[in-house]
Amino acid sequence: MLRLYALGAGVACIALAILVQGLLPIAIPESRETRATRAVRNELGEVKWVWHEASPYTAPEELGRRVYQREGCWYCHSQYVRPVAGESQRWGPVSEVGEYAHDRPHLLSTRRIGPDLTRVGLKVSDHWHFAHHWAPRDVVPDTIMPEFRWLYRKARVPLVDGAERPALGASDALRAIFTFRADAPIPLYPSPDGLAFAAQTDGTPVLDVENLPAPYDRPETWRGRTLTIVAPTDELRGLVAYTQKLGTNRGAWRDAFEPQALAVSVMSIPQTEGQVDRGRVVYGRRCAGCHGVEGDGNGPVATFLDPRPRNFTLGSFKFRSTPSGSLPTDGDLYRTLTRGVRWTAMPTWHELPEKDRVAVIAYVKTFSPRWQEERPEPAIAIGDPPPTTPARLARGKTLYAQAKCAECHGEGGRGDGPAAAGLRDDSRFPIRPTDFTRGQFKAGGDVRDLYRTMTTGLDGTPMPSFADSMTDDERWAISAYVLSLSAFRDPLTGAPLSLDEAARARLNAPDAGRFASPRLALDPTAPPDLAGQPKALVRFHKGILGEGR
């Protein structure tokens, strides 16, 4: 009899599992939801929320998803921002059903041995991921993530004496990786231990050590050495593309993410011995992998990164509220550290304790003698921006052409101007103009951030200051126009979103309170009087989460 009871209990449990985990989810209407609330920037530069179809994976992203499953990434990484205290402040907006419309199977996972990846898309550049999969502990020292070096193509190449500098020796392994097109040189910047990364392979690899910091800029440093040259396989490119896709069906949510909206220009950080000592420890754990132990921007994974990490020994900083040529304020450094630098390998560090952020800034200031010899000039005053109107945007477009912004950034703002390919920073490394259509502004996505950049310039780059050549009003107009180039576009691809004119008009309406959160997202399919009303996102947990979560 006991065996019969046990058998019946087993069958009942199996049936219950099939019902709860198989049949009920299919029956729930939310399981067929293909839309999610998406943050979009309207033409006025404001971030509004709208219900929008989730986009499917591209072929490379699908390949990457299969690699993600095969390599067991989902064993440690979850893909679900839970509706509990603190999750939305740490990771981003709470997950919605529609985000997973194209996931077969779902990879929600339950364990978080590694970080949750729901919102990892566009947090850092592709190049950061290339470095991370090759040498995880050089990027995140306390990680337990293993290396995935079988996802790279590799060649060991001896160096030979060239006419003026070392050159790559002949190698069949190298020819198996690169096409050796004569009109497409691919510069290689080796790390101190002889590792060189190439993101592209359709061209001719060329060793370039002249721009590296001393002593690695000297030919004799490399004489007789053998380099390890690595390039990503199609599987790794797909894995990175899949990773960058995660969370982007929620659009430009980072521009409305409170922890990254820090605005500060003036603060004073004590340069005490204890502060510097603490900063040295933080720097060694969080920064040295990219910026190098000496702060020269030549860390062990710097070869993977484009743009290159900042060389702190030069005392030149891009993102400042001080005039061109001046050192930044402590507040500028704190803002950059907290926000990160979008679409580069510099992540946001808003989760790092404030004491650690303050301390590492004090330590970074020990790398260059400029900090002992000079004081930052006073920060520029940035008031409230003028209202953005169609007339102001039209004026900004005219000024954009007159100021020859298109020479670098292109007429459509895609970063494809005629001068773009030849641009170099002060260290002679290639540097790409920003693609405005994707809204990934390195100094921040608010019109004040763009105005600050227009006024101060970006030291160490070809981006000049327009403080003397343009009036305040002209700089505000260009800033508003540049911001509008990313209106109603996908931040991942820069492609226009499928929103009709009526929906765009409602999102452009100058009413700051409407459509300002996922809970109040515009539903283009609803009648106009109900379009921005709260909508229950998780119907079957109403009693726990509340209406409209």
Regions found by a protein language model. Name each.
Residues A36-Q69, P83-V84, P115, T226, ...:
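Electrostatic cytochrome c docking/interface patches
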Residues Q69-Y75, Y80, I113-D116, E235, ...:
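Short pre-active-site segment immediately N-terminal to redox-active cysteine/selenocysteine motifs
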Residues P56-Q79, P93-E96, E273-V293, T388-R414, ...:
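Sequence/structural segment immediately N-terminal to covalent heme-attachment motifs in c-type
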Residues R225, K245-Q275, A288-T313:
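Accessory recognition modules or surfaces
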Residues L246-W253, T272, D296-N298, W343-W349, ...:
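Inter-heme linker and motif-flanking segments adjacent to c-type heme-binding CXXCH motifs
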Residues A54, T58-E61, G86-T226, V230-T233, ...:
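Extracytoplasmic electron-transfer domains, predominantly the class I c-type cytochrome c fold
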Residues P25-V40:
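Ser/Thr/Pro/Gly-rich low-complexity linker/stalk segments immediately outside membranes or between
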Residues L7-G22:
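Hydrophobic membrane-insertion alpha-helices, especially the h-region
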